[in-house]
Amino acid sequence: MHMIGEDVSEQLDVIPAVLRVKRIRRPRYGCRSCEGAVVQAKAPSRLVDNGMATTALVTSIVVGKFAWHLPLNRQTHMFRGLGIELDRSTLVHWVLRAAWWLRPLYMLLVDMVLASPKVFCDDTPMPVLDRRRRRTRTARFWSYAVDDRPWQGPAVPIVVYIFAEDRKGQHVHEHLTRFNGVLQVDGYTGYRGLTKPDRPGGAITLAYCLAHARRQFFEVYRKSTSSLAAEALQRIGMVYQIEERIRGLTATERVTVRQSQTKPILEAFKVWLMQCLAEESAKSSLAEAIRYTLNHWDGLMVFLTDGRVEVDSNIVERTIRPIALGRRNALFAGSARGAEAWAILSSIINTAKLHELDPQTYLADVLERIVSGQTKVNSLHELLPWAWKAARAEQMVAAA
């Protein structure tokens, strides 16, 4: 018999995770002719002082929790399956240390977001364990996002989360002390003081979210199948059809289309809303939806004259989803310090995801560079996700 050809097939396989022990040898050298002279290489810096975890292992735990939403107690069970007993408190300590090392990079992201001329903002509850009361209290994560991709703008996409003890409007005012520009938000009343001319940094322009107004009418229609609510949804839908067509155009091009096509639709919508409100019972749910829309009308119309502004704040709402998933699985943060670490690590990981980076590869390299001292504080901008990605691409081209 002789071979006349072959058939080749492929199967996708997996190599399960393997834990290993890295042994670091540091020989000591002595001089027989010198009294008390001993030379030894300095021990490499560790992410956890005197700890047994490598940077790669801590990164794996951090990414598991904040990128893939695996609670730490679940990860301890996974380690047990690999034959390693690790207490949850040990993992907590490692995560806190990772956040400590990454705080300067996080603050750089925060500064970049708040220096932008247009920012999205939203918030979400974050239960935090109060050990004295033996129950949780409801704190907040404020999400600030920049994303100019829908209009080909210059800003790179970034999201940062800032932990606050509650939802008081003062936190937003403190966060935005240096911000001056357009803030795209929902209808939360705590934002209103930001429009005052005498505030530090000057008045902020609030652009409201049309999706929130639409949601008001949708709830009315869902509960009552109101024909007026259905018409409101249809009119708002016309606006979204136009927005879909102009996505990706420049800011100037978007304003041109919005002025010629969207503005007449919304002007007619406002007249229709006022007519409906005059005829509707003041206590009806439809009247409430109409009043909500009219009360926020000026902010809802900002996008007509500014092509950088979106019709809604869905971009920042999408950044809230990873926090919600982690919260659902972990139930709560174990302390205020833990919640702050959650905000730091989620900001860096989710910004990396916006740039289509693998969180494990990116974060392991970044932490290694910071911990080892290879990248100094004044060079942290080199580790920002987009800069790191560009540098990695250049290295791959050079190696090809």
Identify the role of each PLM range:
Residues 7-19:
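Short Cys/His-rich Zn2+-coordinating modules
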